[in-house]
Every structure is written in structure tokens, then in C-alpha cells.
Amino acid sequence: MGAQKYLFILIFILYAQVGHSQVPGFFLDENTRRMDIPFLGYSDLIIIQASINDSEPINFILDTGVKANLLFSKTLGDELDLFYSRKLNLMGADGKSILSASISPNNQINIPGLDGIAQTILVLDEDFIGLDKVLGIPVHGVIGYEFFKFNPVKIDYDRNIITFYRSTVFKRRPFGYRSIDMPLVNGKPYINGVIRQADGSSLTVKLLVDTGANHGLLLNVETSDKILLPETVLESDLGTSLGGDLSGVVGRLSRLKIGRLRFKRLITSFPDPTEFSDIIIETGRQGTLGSDILSRTRIILDYTREKFYYQKGEKFNVPFEFDMSGIALRALPTEDKRFYVHHLRKGSPADKVGVREGDEIISVNGIPVEFWELTSIIELLRSEDGKKVKIDIIRQSGQVLMTLTKNITLRRQI
């Protein structure tokens, strides 16, 4: 079965099963004009707590890049006593993996002061994503289009606050903000940007606004023969998505212009084409705008008016940096904090001093990992060219468990 058919089935099933007595969506309590919702910011992703059918609160990523609400574990869905109407097969983002899931219609997803009514949830039979390993904290699912579709939502990355507005009281552009058009296609928001490439040429690109992607700019080279790779690129693991890890190269673009914002020397990902590429091409988009760029701004997403409001945030002028060590870290699925080397870039500073894939990190700069967040170590490893970082590791060699110290000098490679 082709990717198009999988997507059609998904969209049809998710929205054909809701009764007509309730309109699916998220709604403020009566007489409330706006609601501030705090969120956790990990790797610039937005993590909020919500309950399903009066359960204890669990962690969700707020993600404009998906239409369906997702729960990553059927085990958790069973514990929540969810009703499942049928099974479904999905194609993963790598274009190869086939994922099985169950459809649970007509649920309540509640945040204090905000009610998610008649919500359909796609429950994965297995946790194919493993965001716990990537972020180092439990993440149970994703809330997508339904959260945004009726009401303007402001995201303040500086204060880690979401403001959910009643649409009738949000009638004009707020002071200090500018706006551009943001058309919705299949429940997903798109804006136009202009990139300046290595040969000096400029190219207008259609970008998916994706708060659930922790990269900066991603460009799909298969969508246009006018997209050029930068002169210097690194092969890299580009991250984890529904259906597996994505690979490709990263480099720097000299500039991205969005409205009156200009982002300079930005890190840009160029994923390898997959069987899923046909779906991307059909949307007409050339890439994705992720949270490493969005988090440098304050934005208001107004789906009903199809407007993207923006202003500079406190981190706007912070330089874009990529990992300078060569280490991609993951967390082990244990109660105590345990981090290991998931991937090692060949020829990188860590590779040159003898770090290996599978090594477990037990301390960084003399501080045990119990006192580190995974995202804080990742930020350290891309912080400053020439910075020295000492890591203590445990390595299994046959029946022998060795403790080693490695001194890494960070080097900017792009």
C-alpha cells in the first residue's frame, strides 16, 4: 500500500468517527478571555502537561507539524482504559517502516483552564520514537492541530509560557508584532521564507512551521533542483522521528529571511531522500522551520485568520552552533540518569581521543551525570570552539568493565 493511501486512511478515520453532538477542539472555560500555560523547554521543544479522561497529568509535546494527537504507548493507553475502535497501519517518516496503531475516539484532553473536547487519539502499539532517550525526560505523546485550530496561541520561548486566547478578543495585530500570511494545508501551517545560498543566489521556499522539530532550518533537496548544498557539510544523524532515525548532511546557509527577520549563518539540515519524499513534494513545501529558529522569536499562531505574528526574542542574536564534539548522546531507559554514546562522527574530536559508540558517560567536567540534564550536556558540547571538556566513561570490553577519562577539545567543523 502506498504512502498516499496510508495518509488518506489516517485522516479519514481520525475525523470520521467523532459524533456530531460535540465539536472537537480545545476551549477556554466560560468567561475566560485568555489563559497562560507554562511549559517545559527541552531542546527548544514545548512540553506541556495534560490529562486524558481525568487521568494524572502526563507529558505531551505541542507540535504544529502533526494533525493527529498521538500517544506513544499502547501500554499506557490500556492503563488509561482507552476505548479503541479499530487498528491502523502507518508509514514511518523514513518511507520504509510500517507502524501499527489503534484509534481511540471521543476522549477528553484537559489542561487546567482548558478543555480538549471529543479528541481522537492515535495510540502507537509500540514506542517507535523513543523521545525519552533523546530528551532525557518522559514524553508520552503529542498534541497537534486540535490545540490551535479555533484560537490564537502565543508562544513565548523566553518565559516558557503559552498564551491561549479566545478568538473573539484577539482582533488586531498586537503591539510590537509584525505579521505574514500562514496558509493551512491539511491542518498544518506554512510560511514563505527567502534563503541566500552558497553561490549568492536567493530562493523563495515554502516552509512547514513545526514546533515539534528541534532543528533550525531543514531543506528537502528533492523538492527543487534550485536548492544547493553549502560548500562545507557534515554527514550527520539528523534526529529521530515517527518511524526511525533520519540521516543526511548539515551545513550553514548565509541567510534566511522571514518577513523582516533575518537569520544569519544558520545551521541547516539536508535529509537524504526517502520513499516519503513524494508526500513532501505533493505538499509543495521545500522544507521545515524548526524550534532552533522559532525559539529565537516570540510568535502568535492564528489558524482561523491564517496569520503568523512574530517579534525578536531574547536569543535572536545568539549564534547558531552545531555539535563540536562528534558525540550524539541518548539516555538509557532507567529510573536513574544514565547517558551513553549513541553515535560517533568519524574524524571528530571525540573520535580522535578514543571515545566509542556504546560508551556510558558517568561524569562531565568532574560533575556526575546525576546532576546534569541530557540537554545541558548537549548544549555544552556545542558551546564554544576550543573549549576543553573532560568526560569519564565506562566501557565494556569482553568481561572487563573499564573506567576511562577522555579530554575533548571542541572544534567548530561547519
Predicted features, each with a name:
Residues M1-F26:
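Bacterial Sec-dependent N-terminal signal peptides
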Residues H20-I414:
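Pepsin/retropepsin-fold aspartyl endopeptidases
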